Amino acid sequence: MSTRIAFLKGHGTENDFVIVPDPENALDLPPAAVAALCDRRAGLGGDGLLHVVRSAAHPEARGMAAEAEWFMDYRNGDGSVAEMCGNGVRVFARYLQHAGHVTEGDLAVATRGGVKTVHIAKNGDVTVGMGRALLPAGDVEVSVGEREWPARNVNMGNPHAVAFVADLDHAGDLYAPPSHAPAGAYPDGVNVEFVVDRGPRHVAMRVHERGSGETRSCGTGACAVAVATARRDGLDPAATGTPATYTVDVPGGTLVITERPDGEIEMTGPAVIVAEGEFDSAWLEGVLA
Ligand SMILES: N[C@@H](CCC[C@H](N)C(=O)O)C(=O)O
C-alpha cells in the first residue's frame, strides 16, 4: 500500500537540499533512494538530502541524544554519506524552526561530525559553530585538464583541497571531479575549492563537491577556504589572539566566516525553506524496483 511521505525543499546560499522529516527513523533511505530524490530531472532535486531524525532514534546519534535532540543524517546527492555539511546544518535548523520544534536562539544539532551549536538570529541569518579546522601536513596538488595548482589540505570534519587560482574560469566546467595528487592524499574522496581574491579579507570561490558535483555553495568548503586564506595571509588567530574574519563569495551568495583564537570557526549566512509537499511512496518503490 502506498503512503504519502512529507518533504520540504530548502537552501543555504543556493546549496539546496531535499528535507525529509522522519523523527522516529521509520523510513528506509538507501543510497539509491536518496539519489532518486535528489535527481533534478526525475526526482525532487537537490545537492543533498537532510534526513531529520531524533538523535535517540538513530544508531549513529544515540550517544549524542543527551546533548542534541535532533540528528542531521546528511547524504550527498549521489546517496553517499558525508561527515558534515555546513550549509545543511543551517538549513536543518531553519527547518526545525519552521516546523515549530525550536524558536530563534541557540540550539544543538547532532551530526556525524559531532554536536554543532547553531544560532538562529532575529534578522534571519543562521550561524553555526563549525568546530576547528585540521591542517594535515604534506603538499597536495589539484588539476583540471592541463592546469595544475598547489593546494592546501584542510579537514573540516570532511576533506577539502583549497587551490588559489588566477581566475575562477580556469577550473573549467567542473563536470568531472578535479584530479589530485598524491593519489593517496584523500582515500575517501575530496571536496575541491578554487579561490580568487576579491579584496582585503574577501575572497570568491567555486567548489566541486564529493558526491554532488559543482554546487553553488559549500559551507565546510567556505570555512576551509577562510582558514587556508588566513594562513596564506600570515594570520593565525591561535598565535595572535585576534580573530580573523573573511567574507567568502560563492556563486549562490555570501558567507561570513570567523576563526577565533581558540580555533573555533563560526559561519553565518542565509537559510531558506522554499516549499513543502508530499510524494507517493509508490513512486520511490517504482524507481528502486
Ligand atoms: N555542501 C556541504 C558539504 C556536503 C558534504 C560534502 N559534499 C562531502 O562529501 O564532504 C557544506 O555546505 O558543507
Swiss-Prot record:
Binding-site list for substrate: 15, 76, 86-87, 158, 191, 209-210, 219-220
Q: What is its EC number?
A: 5.1.1.7
Could you tell me which Pfam families the record lists for this protein? DAP_epimerase
What positions are marked as the site Could be important to modulate the pK values of the two catalytic cysteine residues?
160, 209
What is the superkingdom listed in this entry's lineage? Answer: Bacteria
Cellular compartments per GO CC: cytosol
Q: Where in or outside the cell is it found?
A: Cytoplasm
> Any idea which GO molecular function terms this record carries?
diaminopimelate epimerase activity
Q: Does the keyword Glycosyltransferase apply?
A: no
Alphabetical UniProt keywords = Amino-acid biosynthesis, Cytoplasm, Isomerase, Lysine biosynthesis
SUPFAM superfamilies for the chain: Diaminopimelate epimerase-like
HAMAP family named among the record's database cross-references: DAP_epimerase
Q: Family, per the entry?
A: Belongs to the diaminopimelate epimerase family.
Q: Which PANTHER family match?
A: DIAMINOPIMELATE EPIMERASE (PTHR31689:SF0), DIAMINOPIMELATE EPIMERASE, CHLOROPLASTIC (PTHR31689)
- What is annotated about its quaternary structure and interactions? Homodimer.
Q: What is this protein called?
A: Diaminopimelate epimerase
Source organism = Streptomyces coelicolor (strain ATCC BAA-471 / A3(2) / M145)
